[in-house]
């Protein structure tokens, strides 16, 4: 996962209405993975994907954003389990779990031409 995606995902978690126990419904709220997909689509990492009626990303979408299935299931379980300050807010524990996800930094390797 790159830093830009992580930052946009965190920003959206603080402003998006949360959907719990149900599949994503754009009008009432989004689940944690739908917010991730929305952020990734905005950054053109994945094509716009309709999360209506589902709450998990496909293997291809996960690979594109750099997230494992295990991380997705962990975050999805937290989305449904933890209580926030309001019924449609994402809990701080969940936001902090996203904040703690590892970021893949590009390697800056100096290549020396063969002399």
State the predicted function of each range.
Residues 1-29, 37-115:
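Domain-length accessory/inserted modules outside core catalytic folds
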């Amino acid at each position: 996962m790159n830093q830009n995606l992580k930052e946009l995902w965190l920003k959206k978690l603080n402003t998006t209405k949360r959907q719990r126990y149900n599949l994503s419904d754009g009008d009432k709220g989004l689940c944690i993975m739908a917010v991730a997909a929305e952020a990734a689509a905005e950054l053109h990492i994945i094509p716009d994907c309709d999360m209506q009626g589902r709450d998990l990303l496909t293997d291809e979408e996960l690979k594109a954003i750099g997230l494992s299935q295990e991380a997705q299931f962990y975050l999805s379980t937290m989305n449904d389990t933890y209580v926030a300050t309001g019924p449609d807010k994402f809990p701080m524990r969940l936001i902090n779990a996203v904040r703690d996800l590892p970021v893949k930094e590009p390697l800056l390797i100096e290549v020396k031409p063969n002399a």
